[in-house]
């Protein structure tokens, strides 16, 4: 980056400082706790009360995942926390979900994957998981509708679906 900045803006450009500030801002934005999705507390409590094992399987670095779990005090719910940072293949490959199912002792066809991303839905479907899309930033499209088991508008609807045995 420094070379490119100097090439475009000349030798007087404080490239090192600019790059350092960009990294700092990016890290700050990435590590800032994300807001909890509506219905998360209720869903986790219900799953826990019914002794359903849970895992976090995220492409984010482990330090970020653990930071969010610690911030919201949710770590105790999860039997496994898996980061894709050390896996050979990331989503849309199903590797992270297959590893999570292995750690939970569940078969993919009996394991629910909740996803808000296209690559996550692709990974869940590729691994043979019960894949429920809960769109956040990107709405479901035709490809997602062909791949997922169900779509829920929020985690309250996921909880209702579980309670009624829909998936």
How would you label these PLM feature ranges?
Residues 18-19, 40, 53, 72, ...:
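Short, flexible segments with low predicted structural confidence
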Residues 45-48, 62-167:
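Asp-based, Mg2+/Mn2+-dependent phosphohydrolase catalytic module
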Residues 4-41, 45, 50:
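Metal-dependent phosphoesterase signature
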Residues 31-32, 53-54, 85, 109:
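A generic structural signal for short
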Residues 55-56, 133:
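Hydrophobic beta-strand core positions in alpha/beta domains
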Residues 58-60:
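Conserved phosphate-coupling serine/threonine residues in phosphotransfer and NTP-handling enzymes
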Residues 1:
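Conserved small/polar residues in nucleotide/adenosyl-binding loops
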